[in-house]
């Protein structure tokens, strides 16, 4: 999927979950965007590219290309 939404660091309790590398498992951020996840079985997609949106203010989502699982 091209142009999925990556959550902003300002929207997450752990801003690092908005800093992803290619191959990072991504889960739902419960608002329609994605965030990095390490929880077993929670991934819905895998990042196809590196995107760092950890410093973004709340609501400033970034576009990211992903492979849906």
Question: What does each of the following model-derived ranges do?
Answer:
Residues 1-69:
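Surface-exposed, low-hydrophobicity beta-strand/loop segments enriched in small/polar/acidic residues
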């Amino acid at each position: 999927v091209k142009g999925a939404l990556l959550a902003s660091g300002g929207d997450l309790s752990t801003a690092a979950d908005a800093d992803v590398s290619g191959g990072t498992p991504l889960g739902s951020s419960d608002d329609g965007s994605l965030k990095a996840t390490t929880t077993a079985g929670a991934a819905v997609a895998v990042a196809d590219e590196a995107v760092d949106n950890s410093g973004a203010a709340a609501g400033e989502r970034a576009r990211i290309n992903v492979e849906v699982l």
